[in-house]
Every structure is written in structure tokens, then in C-alpha cells.
Design a protein with these regions (language model features):
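Core catalytic lobe of class I
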Residues: 2-122
């Protein structure tokens, strides 16, 4: 069955509705409209001073200065009824919970993964 669509409908079919942004998350979100995001999935530094077996480290994993500003912006851009999923370091859960609550998030649950190799935390 064929459907007739006009030019405007045709163009809207190919207009991107999703985007991947690369940059400092706090700065990027400051430029976004309030309540413009449906879903956030974030895997931020865990504040554990991670060091892999090969000596690799993670930027900003040695301090929590970014934590509250980042989650404040996430809460600001997230639509009412939107959903945010955040990974976090289990031994720093108190810092993450404080930041989530201070931003206005309501915690509804935790998901625990069984990993064969978990990095050590100092």
C-alpha cells in the first residue's frame, strides 16, 4: 500500500531527532533548553582515583567538584517524567546520592552488575 506524503512531511521524516554531543557536559548542558531531554544515561568518573592494570587513569576521577553542577544541569534539562540512569562507584554512593537529591532527583532503584573484573579503589 502506497502513502502520499507532502514535501514537509517528507523532510520531517529525515530530520534527526537524536544527537550525540561531545564536550564538557556541564558547559554543553548550560546551552540546552530547560526540559528538552527525555532520557539521560551517564557513566561519569566514579571518584575512586581509578588506575587500571595497565596504569591508565580517568580524568576528573580524583575529585567531586563537578558532581553537583553536572547533576544540577541534568535535572534542569530533563523533561518532567524523564528518566536518568547513572553509573557510580559503589564506595562513593553517598556523594552521588547527595548530588542527585540536591539536584531534585528522586531515586527509584539501583541495578547491580556482576563483573568478573572490578577495578580496585584506593
Amino acid at each position: 500500500m502506497a502513502h502520499n506524503i507532502n514535501r514537509q512531511q517528507s523532510e520531517s521524516l529525515f530530520t534527526p531527532r537524536n544527537a550525540v554531543l561531545h564536550g564538557d557536559c556541564i558547559e554543553l548542558m548550560r546551552g540546552m533548553e530547560r526540559e528538552s531531554v527525555d532520557f539521560i544515561l551517564t557513566d561519569p568518573p566514579y571518584i575512586t582515583r581509578y588506575r587500571g592494570r595497565d596504569g591508565r587513569t580517568v580524568a576528573n576521577d580524583d575529585n567531586s567538584r563537578w558532581l553537583r553542577p553536572a547533576f544540577n544541569q541534568m535535572h534542569r534539562v530533563l523533561k518532567d517524567g524523564g528518566f536518568c540512569v547513572s553509573f557510580y562507584g559503589w564506595n562513593k554512593v553517598d556523594l552521588f546520592v547527595d548530588a542527585w537529591r540536591a539536584a531534585g532527583f528522586r531515586i527509584v532503584g539501583h541495578i547491580v552488575f556482576r563483573k568478573r573484573y572490578a577495578s580496585c579503589a584506593r
